[in-house]
From Swiss-Prot:
Its main location: membrane. Converts testosterone into 5-alpha-dihydrotestosterone and progesterone or corticosterone into their corresponding 5-alpha-3-oxosteroids. It plays a central role in sexual differentiation and androgen physiology. GO terms for biological process: androgen biosynthetic process; cell differentiation; sex differentiation; steroid biosynthetic process. It is a multi-pass membrane protein. InterPro entries: 3-oxo-5-alpha-steroid_4-DH, 3-oxo-5_a-steroid_4-DH_C, SRD5A/TECR. One of its GO terms (molecular function) is 3-oxo-5-alpha-steroid 4-dehydrogenase (NADP+) activity. It catalyses: a 3-oxo-5alpha-steroid + NADP(+) = a 3-oxo-Delta(4)-steroid + NADPH + H(+); 5alpha-pregnane-3,20-dione + NADP(+) = progesterone + NADPH + H(+); 17beta-hydroxy-5alpha-androstan-3-one + NADP(+) = testosterone + NADPH + H(+); androst-4-ene-3,17-dione + NADPH + H(+) = 5alpha-androstan-3,17-dione + NADP(+). Gene3D superfamilies: 1.20.120.1630. The chain crosses the membrane at residues 7-27, 50-70, 84-104, 109-129, 149-169, 208-228. It is found in: Microsome membrane; Endoplasmic reticulum membrane. The gene is SRD5A1. This is 3-oxo-5-alpha-steroid 4-dehydrogenase 1. One of its GO terms (cellular component) is endoplasmic reticulum membrane. Its EC number is 1.3.1.22.
Length: 257
């Protein structure tokens, strides 16, 4: 049974990588029709705050259930590396499901299909990461001092802080009573159009490096594929919307792309 589930977790990780590539191609073709790109006549729109909270919850609930030993004792969570890595995952999704939605100002309705896809992914990936770390991931006794873990943990923290700060910048572009869109200023937005996405990609690449597993890297690959296409869409939109948009700004990676 354990061998079969371990094989399943590896297969799901490789599938997540493949799905990331598929999503990249599809989103390049059709774009991401939610948020500012959603049609005003879209049917079955869900309130933004409620949609964000519910769609992200599986990635918070499943690790918590793993910690509680629901279904099977969390055999590997008696090891510090496993606990810290799972905590990284938990902290991110606690912020995304319990804090971020309630900071949203206004927010266009979320199309039902976008909500369902996000909910399915958070369930899929939440199971993959939490089950692997709680039951199967084995690390050396000195893993906490390994350069991969230290570097990855630092990148995770830096990426999360960039993501949170960039979201704060975006929320405060408009003063009370103002409507419409503005050019983001400050922080990494001085260099790239999608600083919030860059932060999240750095965060999960750091997590992947610290976990040193196909499960962790699958999440990082999927995140990059989805967010980079969204960043390209933003970058193009900004240039079309604002004649004075800074020409030197890159899409998502400072000074490069």
């Amino acid at each position: 049974m354990e061998l079969a589930e371990r094989f399943l977790l590896d297969a799901l990780a490789y599938l997540e990588c493949a799905l990331g590539v598929v999503c990249y191609v599809l989103l390049k073709l059709v774009g991401s029709p939610y948020g500012r790109y959603a049609s005003s006549g879209s049917a079955f729109g869900l309130p933004a705050r409620a949609a964000w909270t519910v769609q992200e919850l599986p990635s918070l609930a499943l690790p918590l259930l793993a910690c509680a030993g629901a279904g099977a004792p969390a055999e590997r969570l008696n090891r510090w590396p496993n606990c810290i890595l799972l905590a990284m995952f938990l902290v991110h999704y606690a912020q995304r499901s319990l804090v971020f939605p309630f900071l949203i100002r206004g927010g266009k309705p979320m199309p039902l299909y976008a909500f369902l896809l996000a909910f399915i992914f958070c369930t899929y990936n939440g199971y993959l990461q939490s089950r692997y770390l709680s039951q199967y991931a084995v690390y050396a006794d000195d893993w906490l001092s390994d350069p991969r873990f230290l570097t990855g943990s630092a990148l995770w923290l830096i990426g999360m802080l960039i993501n949170i700060h960039s979201d704060h910048v975006l929320r405060n572009l408009r003063k009370p009573g103002e409507t419409g869109y503005k050019i983001p200023r400050g922080g990494l937005f001085e260099y790239i159009s999608a600083a919030n996405y860059f932060g999240e990609v750095v965060e999960w690449c750091g997590y992947a490096l610290a976990s040193w597993s196909i499960q962790g890297w699958a999440f990082a690959v999927f995140t990059f594929c989805v967010l980079f296409t969204r960043a390209q869409q933003h970058h193009k939109w900004y240039h079309e919307k604002f004649e004075d948009y800074p020409k030197f700004r890159k899409i998502m990676i400072p000074f490069l792309v």
